[in-house]
């Protein structure tokens, strides 16, 4: 079984700052992490490999520094890491990103064996579009299962997979045939900690580095800014709203009544709405 996991190196959202003049994200000096949803995808892939055998290849597109995230993925237990890096990819939106990553997945299949499953996180915390996974699936002609919370069963002999997909109405149990692409939500499985042996192996491992040409990209005009029909015009931090807090004296004999009275004082329409609702019953 061969599984490809697409990951992304993103700025730590807890430490992101927005430039006050340019309104762009200030990445200098901000620590980077593996996109959290991608970690759940990686854990799901590693669990399947442990159960069924095979290999897990992690793939990322980014600057040379993204190799750090790939080595972290190797520490978790991935078997192989591929870095897709080239100046032609700079400024890619989701359309250009899916073109480059889909091309790289094809190259991985030609070089290391066709993948049975391609995993991504449901979205990245820096872009929040949730478009890259489905876009890769479309370009590769793969069936896709999105917003998956749990891998329920894999039948390699029957070439099928069953998953639990979270939806607004509850949980859907879906089954499809392999190969397919899966985007993962926060999973119930705890993300494993890499063993010391894995950390040593990751430090010595050779990361496969591909340029656009190495990966087989045929049309550079579909990459980077040239291949991106959308651009981020402005990023800004929402202004903080000052809310006045009222302390309710819970030493009163009826603290709940005092709290409700204060709420109705602030939201008089709420009292009328509740009264109308009560009359309806």
Swiss-Prot record:
SUPFAM superfamilies under this entry? Adenine nucleotide alpha hydrolases-like (SSF52402)
Pfam assignment, any one: ETF
* Disulfide links within the chain: none
One GO BP annotation here? nitrogen fixation
Query: Sorted alphabetically, which CDD domains does this protein's record hold?
Result: ETF_beta (cd01714)
Query: Which keywords appear in this protein's UniProt record, sorted alphabetically?
Result: Electron transport, Nitrogen fixation, Transport
Q: Which InterPro entries match?
A: ET-Flavoprotein_bsu_CS, ETF_a/b_N, ETF_b, ETF_beta_N, Rossmann-like_a/b/a_fold
Question: In the UniProt record, does the keyword S-adenosyl-L-methionine occur?
Answer: no
Query: Which segments does the entry list as coiled coil?
Result: none
Output one GO MF annotation: electron transfer activity
* UniProt family annotation: Belongs to the ETF beta-subunit/FixA family.
Q: How does it assemble?
A: FixA and FixB form a heterodimer.
UniProt function note: May play a role in a redox process involved in nitrogen fixation.
The name this protein carries in UniProt is Protein FixA
Originating species: Azorhizobium caulinodans (strain ATCC 43989 / DSM 5975 / JCM 20966 / LMG 6465 / NBRC 14845 / NCIMB 13405 / ORS 571)
């Amino acid at each position: 079984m061969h599984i490809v996991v697409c990951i992304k190196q993103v700025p730590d959202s807890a430490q992101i700052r927005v430039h006050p003049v340019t309104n762009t994200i200030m990445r200098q000096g901000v620590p980077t992490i593996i996109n959290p949803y991608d970690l759940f995808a990686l854990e799901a892939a590693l669990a399947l490999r442990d159960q069924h055998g095979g290999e897990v290849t992690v793939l990322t597109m980014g600057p040379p520094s993204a190799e750090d995230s790939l080595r972290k993925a190797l520490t978790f237990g991935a078997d192989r890491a591929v870095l897709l890096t080239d100046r032609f990819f700079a400024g890619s939106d989701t359309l250009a990103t899916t073109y480059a990553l889909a091309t790289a997945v094809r190259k991985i299949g030609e070089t290391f064996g066709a993948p049975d499953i391609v995993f991504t996180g449901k979205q990245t915390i820096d872009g929040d579009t949730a478009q890259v996974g489905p876009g890769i699936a479309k370009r590769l002609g793969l069936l896709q299962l999105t917003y998956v919370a749990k891998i329920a069963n894999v039948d390699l002999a029957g070439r099928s997979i069953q998953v639990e997909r979270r939806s607004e109405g509850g949980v859907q149990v879906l089954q499809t045939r392999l190969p397919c692409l899966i985007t993962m939500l926060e999973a119930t499985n705890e993300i494993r900690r890499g063993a010391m042996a894995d950390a040593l192996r990751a430090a010595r491992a050779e990361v496969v580095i591909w340029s656009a040409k190495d990966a087989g990209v045929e049309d550079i005009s579909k990459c980077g800014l040239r291949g991106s029909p959308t651009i981020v015009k402005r990023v800004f931090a929402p202004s903080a709203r000052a809310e006045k807090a009222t302390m309710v004296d819970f030493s009163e004999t009826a603290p709940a009544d005092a709290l409700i009275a204060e709420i109705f004082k602030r939201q008089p329409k709420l009292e009328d709405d509740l009264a109308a609702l009560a009359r309806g019953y």
